[in-house]
Amino acid sequence: MAHKKGASSSRNGRDSNAQRLGVKRFGGQFVKAGEIIVRQRGTHFHPGELVGRGKDDTLFALSAGHVQFGHRRGRRVVNVVEQVAAPAA
């Protein structure tokens, strides 16, 4: 392999695409079942009540409700709180 630059060659010109990670639905926002709440690498956030975890550590809602962030045993957890239907009068 040549270690000197040949005519009109360059060592630059490569860049990877962004992974678009992060929180997609914030605390208090309404989500439907299956909606992605957090895209992450590793378990920065852990799944709580009514939240599932995909094989790439993505957190998603298992049921419709409002997103709630909190702590449990020193871990940051994401919960989905179901809406309680108002009693019919």
UniProtKB/Swiss-Prot annotation:
Which family does the UniProt entry place this protein in? Belongs to the bacterial ribosomal protein bL27 family.
- Coiled-coil positions are none
Organism encoding this protein: Frankia alni (strain DSM 45986 / CECT 9034 / ACN14a)
Q: Quick one: where's region Disordered?
A: 1-21
Q: Which Pfam families match?
A: Ribosomal_L27
Q: What is this protein called?
A: Large ribosomal subunit protein bL27
Name the Gene3D superfamilies on file.
2.40.50.100
InterPro entries xref list = Ribosomal_bL27, Ribosomal_bL27_CS
* UniProt-listed HAMAP family: Ribosomal_bL27
Q: Gene encoding this polypeptide?
A: rpmA
Q: What lineage, starting at the top, does this entry show?
A: Bacteria, Bacillati, Actinomycetota, Actinomycetes, Frankiales
Q: Which domain of life is it from?
A: Bacteria
Q: Name one GO cellular component term.
A: cytosolic large ribosomal subunit
Give the Polar residues compositional bias ranges.
Answer: 7-19
Biological process terms in GO annotation: translation
Q: Which UniProt keywords apply?
A: Ribonucleoprotein, Ribosomal protein
